[in-house]
């Protein structure tokens, strides 16, 4: 087992990475506020791992669970209320601990419920998708979507621990594996050229779910994210580089309807647009751009926007992105591989031409 630490002073917490961790009570017990626990999961994960986690937590005096519908389209205030309804009906108090057993949607919603219930209770992240293991479970971003924009309602609220059992990836659908690899690739592009080069060599091993390759990719990804979040917990500065491709990607998700493209697919196509814009601006060498696009494609991710999405649709959704400052669009772009910047200082004409060139059908 590997253990990382996200250093946030009093809000610091461990990130455990290894196999069969769901069966280890010692990883959970120190992080429970009391013997009250509510496990939040979804209809896909519950048949696979809920009983296993409940057995691990069988020493708890009060152990309840709630099973949410699966999918980004259910990341809403209405479904969030299901968690609150269960907490209240089962008389959980402010000493309870919520455990998020699932992917990014479950983790984001459980964290937001924990931030809100009785003005804040503890929670633990147990991510079951590659994307949530390397990204959404670490860093304290929680929330739900709004019809006009992704993650528009939420809070920064840190977990007590993140327990990453790599063995659960054995049951992950191939599409979700590729989606998670989008976030893994992102870390190499924005901050770590040796890791990017390692990914170029080891993508076949990752797609084949070789355990050592996956564990290494997860550890490096979490270490990069932990390092960035430790410097900028509330995303007022450098943390925004973790959103490479996300402004374009969130626009795709909002336009298509949540759930049509999974998040990692939208981020993959978004990173291609971000790299191509960086190249057209003269900030990223064309060969480096080609390498990034090739790696994204090798992971089985889309490299083009969805057919029928217009440049105007992109601009309309990007205008409400959370990085917009004083009415100005800011993007995460590349000044070379391994060097991401957050900037609004780019030629908008170049962006508009890129979207015209890439938006087809």
UniProtKB/Swiss-Prot annotation:
Class of enzymatic activity (EC top level): lyase
Binding site for NAD(+): 70-75, 104-108, 128-129, 141, 150
Annotated CDD domains: DHQS
One function term, GO molecular function aspect: 3-dehydroquinate synthase activity
Entry keyword Zinc: yes
Binding positions (Zn(2+)): 183, 246, 263
EC number: 4.2.3.4
Functional pathway: Metabolic intermediate biosynthesis; chorismate biosynthesis; chorismate from D-erythrose 4-phosphate and phosphoenolpyruvate: step 2/7
InterPro entries given in the database record: Dehydroquinate_synthase (IPR050071), DHQ_synth_AroB (IPR016037), DHQ_synth_fam (IPR030963), DHQS/DOIS_N (IPR030960), DHQS_C (IPR056179)
GO terms under biological process: amino acid biosynthetic process; aromatic amino acid family biosynthetic process; chorismate biosynthetic process
Catalytic activity, reaction form: 7-phospho-2-dehydro-3-deoxy-D-arabino-heptonate = 3-dehydroquinate + phosphate
Keywords from the named record: Amino-acid biosynthesis, Aromatic amino acid biosynthesis, Cobalt, Cytoplasm, Lyase, Metal-binding, NAD, Nucleotide-binding, Zinc
Superkingdom of source: Bacteria
Record note on cofactor: Binds 1 divalent metal cation per subunit. Can use either Co(2+) or Zn(2+).
GO cellular component labels: cytoplasm
Subcellular location: Cytoplasm
UniProt cofactor(s): Co(2+); Zn(2+); NAD(+)
Function in brief: Catalyzes the conversion of 3-deoxy-D-arabino-heptulosonate 7-phosphate (DAHP) to dehydroquinate (DHQ).
Family the UniProt entry places it in: Belongs to the sugar phosphate cyclases superfamily. Dehydroquinate synthase family.
NCBIfam families attached to this UniProt entry: aroB
Database matches in PANTHER family: 3-DEHYDROQUINATE SYNTHASE (PTHR43622), 3-DEHYDROQUINATE SYNTHASE, CHLOROPLASTIC (PTHR43622:SF7)
Identification of the protein by name: 3-dehydroquinate synthase
Organism, scientific name: Teredinibacter turnerae (strain ATCC 39867 / T7901)
């Amino acid at each position: 087992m590997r253990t990382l630490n996200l250093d946030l002073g009093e809000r610091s917490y461990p990130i455990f990475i290894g196999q069969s961790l769901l069966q280890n009570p010692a990883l959970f017990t120190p992080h429970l506020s009391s013997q009250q626990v509510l496990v939040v999961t979804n209809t896909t994960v519950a048949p696979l791992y809920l009983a296993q986690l409940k057995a691990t937590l069988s020493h708890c005096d009060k152990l309840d669970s709630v099973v949410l519908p699966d999918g980004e389209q259910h990341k809403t205030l209405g479904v969030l209320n299901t968690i609150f309804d269960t907490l209240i009906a089962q008389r959980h108090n402010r000493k309870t601990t919520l455990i998020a057993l699932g992917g990014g949607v479950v983790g984001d919603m459980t964290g937001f419920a924990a931030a809100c219930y009785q003005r804040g209770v503890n929670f633990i992240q147990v991510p079951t998708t590659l994307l949530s293991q390397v990204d959404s479970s670490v860093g304290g971003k929680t929330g739900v979507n709004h019809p006009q924009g992704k993650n528009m309602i939420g809070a920064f609220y840190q977990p007590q621990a993140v327990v990453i059992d790599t063995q659960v990836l054995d049951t992950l659908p191939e599409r979700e594996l590729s989606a998670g690899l989008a976030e893994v690739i992102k870390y190499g592009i924005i901050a770590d050229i040796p890791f990017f080069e390692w990914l170029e060599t080891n993508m076949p091993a990752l797609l084949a779910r070789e355990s050592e390759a996956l564990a290494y990719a997860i550890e490096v990804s979490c270490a990069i994210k932990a390092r960035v979040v430790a410097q900028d917990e509330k995303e007022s500065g450098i943390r925004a580089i973790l959103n490479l491709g996300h402004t374009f990607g969130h626009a795709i998700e909002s336009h298509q309807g949540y759930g049509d493209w999974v998040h990692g697919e939208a981020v993959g196509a978004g990173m291609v647009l971000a790299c191509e814009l960086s190249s057209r601006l003269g900030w990223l060498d064309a060969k480096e751009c080609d390498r990034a696009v090739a790696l994204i494609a090798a992971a089985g991710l889309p490299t083009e926007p969805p057919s029928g999405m217009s440049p105007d649709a992109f601009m309309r959704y990007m205008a409400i992105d959370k990085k917009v400052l004083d009415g100005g669009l800011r993007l995460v772009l590349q000044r070379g591989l391994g060097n991401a910047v957050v900037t609004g200082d780019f030629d908008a004409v170049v962006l508009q031409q890129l979207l015209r060139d890439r938006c087809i059908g």
